[in-house]
Amino acid sequence: MNYRMTISYDGTRYHGWESKKEVDTIEGKLEAVFARMTEQDVKIHGAGRTDAGVHAMGMVANGFLDTTLTPEEIKAYANHYLPDDICIRDVTVASERFHARLNAKGKVYQYTCYIGDEKPVFDRMYTWVLPEWVTKGTSDRIPDIEAMQKAAGYLIGTHDFRSFCGNNKMKKSTVRTIYDITIAEEEGYLRMTFHGNGFLQNMVRILTGTLLEVGYGRKAAEDMEAILAACDRQMAGPTAPPHGLMLLEVEY
């Protein structure tokens, strides 16, 4: 039977989502637990492949499990054996044709930066404390959020986002649709939320780095148009580190 599950995880100590030999991954941990439960090899399909160090609040996955356990019992069993930094939030029976990645209609990611005066001791694993090389030359650490939001406006819609793709050998289509980008600052935390139909490798992190360059005056908001048109990774800004990124939701 095909089961759909929603998963939260702290990606700090994992080499990303996708199973890899000899290193810990989220998918690998899940498959190992379900193999133990069913005494069979199990393949789990995630809605996306988050990079090493990236976190998720609402990753969706599916897998065929040969078991007599109820969904609630599957959830309880898995959470008992999974490490404390991975949690299955819910399990439901899905249609035989449901596939977490192929059926996904949209994703919401959030990137969090810290621009306050005090070290965010308890959030440091989930927040990028902006270093001096990002904020250098500005009178304070607070970026021009209005300029960043204006720049984000050029990204809304369907575009070729090759300039914002971390894989320069990408042969598949790099066209994606972004529905909305919101940027807000509160009590020293700068949060950028990206809602789209899908995202390329490192895309959200490169968008974040580029928007920060606008916020700190290294690029103009209007430059986004030329960056998109260039289809050249070198035109965009730096790739923000993974630990500030969180997958919030997958839409179906």
Protein language model annotation of sequence segments:
Residues 1-252:
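Structured-RNA-binding interfaces characteristic of tRNA pseudouridine synthases
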